[in-house]
Curated annotation (Swiss-Prot):
Binding-site positions, FMN: P14, M15, V16, Q87, K159, H187, N221, G222, D223, A245, R246
Biological process (GO), any one: tRNA dihydrouridine synthesis
The keyword Cytoplasm is annotated on this UniProt entry: yes
InterPro entries, sorted: Aldolase_TIM, DUS-like_FMN-bd, tRNA-DUS-like, tRNA_hU_synthase_CS
Superkingdom, taxonomy of origin: Eukaryota
Localisation per UniProt entry: Cytoplasm; Nucleus
Substrates-to-products reaction catalysed: 5,6-dihydrouridine(20) in tRNA + NADP(+) = uridine(20) in tRNA + NADPH + H(+); 5,6-dihydrouridine(20) in tRNA + NAD(+) = uridine(20) in tRNA + NADH + H(+); a 5,6-dihydrouridine in mRNA + NAD(+) = a uridine in mRNA + NADH + H(+); a 5,6-dihydrouridine in mRNA + NADP(+) = a uridine in mRNA + NADPH + H(+)
Main location: cytoplasm
Enzyme class label: oxidoreductase
Name of the molecule in the record: tRNA-dihydrouridine(20) synthase [NAD(P)+]
Organism: Schizosaccharomyces pombe (strain 972 / ATCC 24843)
Functional note: Catalyzes the NADPH-dependent synthesis of dihydrouridine, a modified base found in the D-loop of most tRNAs. Specifically modifies U20 in cytoplasmic tRNAs. Also able to mediate dihydrouridylation of some mRNAs, thereby affecting their translation.
Amino acid sequence: MGLLNYSNKVCLAPMVRIGELPMRLLALRYGANLVWGPEIVDKALLSGTPVERVVNDRINCIDFVKPPSNKVLFRVHPLEANRLIFQLGSASPELAVEAAKLVANDVAGIDLNCGCPKHFSVHAGMGAGLLKNQDRLVSILDALVNEIGKPYKISISCKIRLLETKEDTLKLVERICDTGVRAITVHCRTTPMRNTEPADRSYLSEIVGVCRNKDVSILVNGDVLSYNDGLDVIEKYGVDGVLIARAAERNVSCFRIEGPLSSFKVAEEFLKMALEVDNNFGNTKYCLNQIMQGSFRKNVRQLAQTAKTYEDLKKAFEIEYKHSDASSVCPTLEKEKSLVISFVDLPSFLESLLASNILKQLSRLHFTKIFAVSEEEDICKQLDDIHEKFLCHGIALSLISADNLASAIASAHLVICMEKDESIMNEAVCDQKITIRLPINSNTNEAVVECENKSMQSKHALDIIQERIKDLEEKAQVV
């Protein structure tokens, strides 16, 4: 799968019962960058006869079934595999590793649950119980990093809660970082706190500082209400990403940049998705009941709540549905994209990009890599700080020379270059790439761009690029 990039990610949080396959696929369709599955305890996978991996050709999924009943404990769709984090409940390094091996080839990451406050979890030494036995917590993460993360080349992370004091929390975060995990999610509430109590972000910036010093990604959970709210939290506190739980439970279209859809529309689309992936009826009905809370069509809600079968649910929502090839219900998710940039004063131009809103636009369009063209030998040192700043936006910056130009353009979705760069222009045209050209004014030797037959100075170049990228965003929304 490859290691995950958590930067600038707005994600579906792990939720028991809610986070099954149809909800995850719907979250990704609406705009979630990563999705966590519901916690599954190691012993559920291992006790008796271990789960078996079965290819379900009828719905194009991978099922993990428990013999002899063949009950499906976990179902993965290929569309989500490289964005799916499997959350594991465990109190044992040995069992955690054994369980993780069963699913490691079909997910992008394994996340250890160290925050669930439920009695069954804490009583068994799992979830928030691990916060009181930090040596065990660290030993499980050590084992997962070394025996799963490294050999399977997937990301290992954990999700914790705040401890009673800031000092204790910071010490724990530092210990976790030292295990070699790729990311930590902090639920900004202590174990005794109810989810209705406001999240405590009073020292979140200090937690971020510890993670930055250890080169570990930091995500935050608690009171994040929408995709745009998540981006604001990322910018305000300097975290890499956020997880959304309760807001997504009520209306998973909270991941839409354009704003949420009506509860009825979401319920209707959820039902279609559940039918498409053959979701357990009881789980589908449970999730629909969460979506239908509050303002909802009374007659539909009554019929849905008394439904005994999928046929009853289809009648309640007045939909005619037949199993398809999933092309309409499970559309292909956006793949991560790259772009190539060539400019006269590259460091200055990249600094200008950082100061603009363009990186956020690129992130929304799933751009994760920028290849910057340069033949200057000493430019690497100049770009060290810039490189780190780009990573904070979820975009990796790489320098390339003319030798690597053709392959970079071949894989790129967008090329930004000066018109004088004929080799780049020709390559981009041949590969039919979307191109933003920056002609050079021979009198001033400054970069300018053409817009409606008028030349503009380089200080306006970013404005024009931004407008072009807005066009791409609008086209993406239409598609």
